[in-house]
Swiss-Prot record:
GO biological process, alphabetically ordered: gluconeogenesis; glucose 6-phosphate metabolic process; glycolytic process
Protein's name according to its UniProt entry: Glucose-6-phosphate isomerase
Disulfide bridge partners, by residue number: none
Keywords assigned: Cytoplasm, Gluconeogenesis, Glycolysis, Isomerase
Source species of the chain: Pseudoalteromonas atlantica (strain T6c / ATCC BAA-1087)
Length: 547
C-alpha cells in the first residue's frame, strides 16, 4: 500500500462505503425530510444540490478529513502564491492571475506578473474595439467581419465552447469560426463561403509550431493569397497569440498584432489569457470581462469558504468517494441547455488531461484509481440514448445535471418541459422503481402470472444512482466563468488528494513526437520504415493509396 491508501481515514472510508452499499437513498429521503436542504450549497450564482448522493454525515466528515490529511488547503495556497507546483516542468501554475481582480500583486520568480497581465487585457480591449467599430480594416478597406480562430486543444475548446454557451450575448456584426482538426475538410468548409477581404485569421499557438495549427494557418494563408491578397497584406488579416514573435513576424504578421502567452499558463487553462481573444471578439469586451469576473469570484470562494460550503471541494470529494470506494470509472455531465452542449467536451480535456496520471509526485506508481472518463451530452437528447445505461447498467456512473432556471427569449413551455425532464431524471436515478411497483402497474394488462412477473422483473429500476444538480439563475458570462473555475478547482483538489501532477501532459507530448516521426515516413516515400510491423503496414498502405 502507498501512504494514501494506508491511512486510517482511507480505511474508514472503505468501511463506510461497504455500509452505504447496503442502504438506499430512497429510504434516507423518506426518513429525513431535511435531507435536501442539509446537502445544498450556493456560491457565485451556482446552486449545488448534492443530496442525491450516496453520502451520510459520517461519510462527509471522513472525506473532509482526507482532504486535510492530503494538505489540499496548503497545496491550494501554494498554487495561488505562484510556487512551482508543476514539478516535472518546473513551472508555476497561475491561470488564476489572469482573472485576478483583487489589485494585489502575483509573483513568479520574484517578479509581479500583474502589470503584464493587465497590459495584455488592455491590448485585447483595444483590439476588440477596433474590430467592432469597423476602424480596423482589411487591405481593400473593408471592415473585418469574419474571424477564423485556429488552434487546438485548449486553444480551441475553451474559446469555442465558451462562445457557444453565451450565444444570447453575441456581438451582432462579427462572426467567429473555429478550426482545430488538421483534417483538411474542416478548414476548407470554413473558408469556402468567406470573403478574404473581410476575414481576419487568429492563430493561437504558444510555440507557433503546433503541427495542426500551423498547417491550418498555412492553408488559410494560401487561400488568402490565391484569392488576391499579397504577402504584404498578410499583416492586416493575420494575427497571433504566441510566445514565438520571430516565427510570427517571419510569417508576415505585424509585431503589434501578436498577443503574449506565458509558461505559467497551461493550454487547458488558457482561455483566461489572450487565447480568449476570440471570446472577446464574439461577446464584446465587457461580457468577456464578466467571464473573468465570475472565475475570480469562484477563486475567492475556493480560497476562503470552509470545506463543507466549498463547491469545488464538495464536488471533488464526492468524485473521490465514487472513484476510489465504489469503483466508478466515469463521470457524466448532462447540461440541460442547448448552448451548453459542448461543456462536457471542455471538462473532458480539463479533467482527463490533468488527472489521467499513474505516477505520484515522488515517482511512485499509484495503487488506486485516479482520473475518470468524462463524457456527456445535452439533455434531453441523452435520455433517448445512453441514459438507459445509467439507469439499469451494471456500472455506477455519477452524474452532474445542469440547468439555467431562466433562458432569455425562449418559450416558457419549452423550458418547463426541459426542467421537468432534468428533475425527473435525477429523481428516477435516485429512487428507481421496485419490482412490486412494476408488478402493480401491470395489473389488468391481460398478462398471465408468469408474463407479469417476467415483465416486472425487466422493468425494475434499482435506483441508488448518484447525481449532483447545478442550477443557475441564468447562464450569463459571469456565471459561466464561475462554473468553469469550479470544475478547474475540483480537478485540482482531486489531483492534490491523489498526489499526481495535474499540470503536465506527457502522454500528449508523446503523441506529438510520434506523429511527427510517422509524418516524415509518410511524406518521404523512399525512407525506410523502422516502426513495429503494424505501424509499418499502415504507413505502407497509406503510401500505396496515395501514390
Amino acid at each position: 500500500m502507498t501512504a494514501l491508501t494506508d491511512t486510517p481515514t482511507w480505511q474508514t472510508l472503505a468501511s463506510l462505503a461497504e455500509d452505504v452499499k447496503q442502504q438506499h437513498m430512497r429510504d434516507w429521503f423518506a426518513s429525513d425530510t431535511s435531507r435536501a436542504s442539509k446537502y445544498q450549497q450556493t456560491a457565485c450564482g451556482i446552486e449545488l444540490d448534492f443530496s442525491k448522493n450516496l453520502i451520510t454525515d459520517d461519510v462527509l466528515k471522513a472525506l473532509f478529513a482526507l482532504a486535510d490529511e492530503s494538505q489540499v488547503s496548503q497545496k491550494r495556497d501554494a498554487m495561488f502564491k505562484g510556487d512551482i507546483i508543476n514539478h516535472t516542468e518546473k513551472r508555476a501554475v497561475l491561470h488564476t492571475a489572469l482573472r485576478n481582480f483583487s489589485g494585489e500583486p502575483v509573483y513568479v520568480d520574484g517578479q509581479d506578473v500583474m502589470p503584464e497581465v493587465l497590459a495584455c487585457q488592455d491590448k485585447i480591449k483595444d483590439f476588440v474595439a477596433s474590430i467592432h467599430s469597423g476602424e480596423r480594416k482589411g487591405y481593400t478597406g473593408k471592415a473585418l467581419k469574419q474571424i477564423v480562430s485556429i488552434g487546438i486543444g485548449g486553444s480551441f475548446l475553451g474559446p469555442k465552447i465558451m462562445s457557444e454557451a453565451l450565444k444570447p450575448y453575441w456581438f451582432d456584426g462579427v462572426k467567429v469560426h473555429f478550426v482545430a482538426n488538421v483534417d483538411g475538410c474542416h478548414i476548407q468548409d470554413v473558408l469556402a463561403n468567406l470573403d478574404h477581404e473581410e476575414t481576419l485569421v487568429v492563430m493561437s499557438s504558444k510555440s507557433f509550431t503546433t503541427q495542426e495549427t500551423l498547417q491550418n494557418t498555412l492553408t488559410a494563408k494560401d487561400w488568402f493569397l490565391n484569392a488576391g491578397g499579397t504577402q504584404q497584406d498578410i499583416a492586416k488579416h493575420f494575427i497571433a497569440v504566441s510566445s514565438n514573435i520571430k516565427a510570427a513576424t517571419d510569417f508576415g504578421m505585424a509585431e503589434d498584432n501578436i498577443f503574449p502567452m506565458w509558461d505559467w499558463v497551461g493550454g487547458r487553462y488558457s482561455l483566461w489569457s489572450a487565447i480568449g481573444l476570440p471570446i472577446a471578439l464574439t461577446l464584446g469586451y465587457d461580457n468577456y470581462r464578466q467571464l473573468l469576473q465570475g472565475a475570480f469570484e469562484m477563486d475567492e470562494h475556493f480560497k476562503t469558504a470552509p470545506a463543507e460550503q466549498n463547491l469545488p471541494m464538495l464536488t471533488a470529494l464526492l468524485g473521490v468517494w465514487y472513484i476510489n470506494f465504489f469503483g466508478a470509472q466515469s463521470h457524466v455531465l448532462l447540461p440541460y441547455y442547448h448552448y451548453l452542449r459542448g461543456f462536457p467536451a471542455y471538462v473532458q480535456q480539463l479533467d482527463m488531461e490533468s488527472n489521467g496520471k499513474n505516477i505520484s509526485g515522488d515517482t511512485t506508481a499509484v495503487d488506486y484509481a485516479t482520473g475518470p472518463i468524462i463524457w456527456g451530452s445535452e439533455g434531453t437528447n441523452g435520455q433517448h440514448s445512453f441514459h438507459q445505461l445509467i439507469h439499469q447498467g451494471t456500472l455506477l456512473i455519477p452524474a452532474d445535471f445542469m440547468l439555467p432556471l431562466n433562458v432569455p427569449n425562449q418559450d416558457n413551455t419549452h423550458h418547463a418541459m426541459l426542467a421537468s425532464n432534468c428533475f425527473g431524471q435525477t429523481q428516477a436515478l435516485m429512487q428507481g422503481k421496485t419490482f412490486d411497483e412494476c408488478y402493480a402497474d401491470l395489473e389488468g394488462k391481460g398478462l398471465d402470472e408468469a408474463e407479469r412477473v417476467k415483465l416486472a422483473t425487466h422493468k425494475t429500476m434499482p435506483g441508488n444512482k448518484p447525481s449532483n444538480t447545478l442550477l443557475f439563475e441564468q447562464m450569463d458570462p459571469k456565471t459561466l466563468g464561475s462554473l468553469v473555475a469550479m470544475y478547474e478547482h475540483k480537478v485540482f483538489v482531486q489531483g492534490a488528494i491523489w498526489g499526481v501532477n495535474s499540470f503536465d501532459q506527457w502522454g500528449v507530448e508523446l503523441g506529438k513526437e510520434l506523429g511527427n516521426q510517422v509524418l516524415d515516413k509518410i511524406v518521404n516515400t523512399d525512407a525506410a520504415l523502422g516502426f513495429d510491423s503494424s505501424t509499418n503496414a499502415l504507413i505502407a498502405r497509406f503510401r500505396q493509396a496515395n501514390s
